[in-house]
Amino acid sequence: MALVAGLRAFGAKWPSWLRRSPWAPLSAGFCSPGSARPAGPESEPRLTSTRQQDGIRNIVLSNPRRRNALSLAMLKSLRSDILHEAESEDLKVIIISAEGPVFSSGHDLKELTGAQGRDYHTEVFQTCSEVMMLIRNHPVPIVAMVNGLATAAGCQLVASCDIAVASDKSSFATPGVNVGLFCSTPAVALGRAVPRKVALEMLFTGEPISAQEALRHGLISKVVPEEQLEEEATRIAKKIASLSRSVVALGKATFYKQLPQDLSTAYFLASQAMVDNLTLKDGQEGIEAFIQKRRPVWSH
């Protein structure tokens, strides 16, 4: 599966929950319907909070005093929250949001001084890249709910999500060039989300773009007033959660698989996926329900 390939590319070891039944229920140590995730015994600080209910997992970047910087500890917390029970049928969609007026300011520059050393710097950027790849390879859609500033790796996080809803007060930038650190890793996601010349202007100047500009260029999916942001992101998530997990997972994987291909190969892959979709229990259930003029009953 794509999630397997994504982790293997980084030499990651599989956590024990992926070696168990793929439909195992959520463990008590993470979250349960309507409950928040308790702090674990790990020595590393938990810089995210999570909550899951009705198939929707909310992951909140919870370090507003540090502008929700994607420090190594934050990245590890986020990675853990994304990976947890990724194959569980209880999970249909993930929303990533943040506390405070800044969605994320990107990497913590205090971790990037010469005193930290090359090995530490390598771990920071490899972990960040792994998180972005996990979002792409995850079987369920991941929605960014942005209220405020998203810069550098924070902008990269938004660009990496499948869907992004932002408040009209949000803005986006890749300002690393201003401090002598070009946003090369954010450019990977940004350059795949917006036109090349738009991406390069953002990268070369470091100047921010507004939420409306981000919408126009395709960095985000929708702009809403701040007071409607949570409602709109939740509405989208609930709609996704009401659908067949297996059908959506196949569709997401196929979309990203065909995207870099030439037209002929893309249609070949998509045609195969359509046939595979018809072999799914929910594929036949949906068609039969339509013919019988009733609501489909999804297996998960």
UniProtKB/Swiss-Prot annotation:
Keywords assigned: Fatty acid metabolism, Lipid metabolism, Mitochondrion, Transit peptide
Q: Which residue positions does N6-succinyllysine occur at? A: 110
Entry's InterPro entries? ClpP/crotonase-like_dom_sf, Enoyl-CoA_hydra/iso, Enoyl-CoA_hydra_C, Mitochondrial_ECH-domain
Q: Name one Pfam family in it.
A: ECH_1
> What's in the GO CC field?
mitochondrion
What is the documented function of this protein? May play a role in fatty acid biosynthesis and insulin sensitivity.
Q: What is this protein called?
A: Enoyl-CoA hydratase domain-containing protein 3, mitochondrial
What species is this protein from?
Rattus norvegicus
This protein's encoding gene = Echdc3
